[in-house]
C-alpha cells in the first residue's frame, strides 16, 4: 500500500507542487491531497491491522506469529511517514534540496539511535515503536518548516 501511495505522489503530486506558483493555490493543493490520501491510508492501515493474522499465515509460517505484535507501531509509523512525506515533497518541488538531504540524514540517524535505545529497553517491539516515534517527530518538523504556508490566515 505504501508503494501505491508513493508512486502516486511521484507521478502526480510532485510535478503538481512544482508547477504551482501561488502560496494560496499550493496550500489548497496540499490540503486537497491530505483529504484524499489520509482516508485511503487509514482504511489500508486498519485493513492490514485487522488482517494481520491472515497476512502472517499466508506470507510466512507459524514461526512468525510473534510479529503480529509489531504491526501496530509499524502501521502507525507508516501513517506518520506518508503524512510527513506529503509535506517533505514540498522541499523537492521548491528546490530546497539541502534542507531535504539534511532532514533525511538527521532522521535516519535519529531512527537508528531511537531503535538502539528502544530495542534495549523494550525488545523487538522497540524497533517499530522507534520507527513510529521517528516519523511522528519528522511530521512535526515538516509542519514547523512549512508552518507559514500551512497555517497562514486566509
Q: Which functions belong to the PLM regions below?
A:
Residues 108-140:
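Membrane-interface helix-loop junctions in multi-pass transport and translocation proteins
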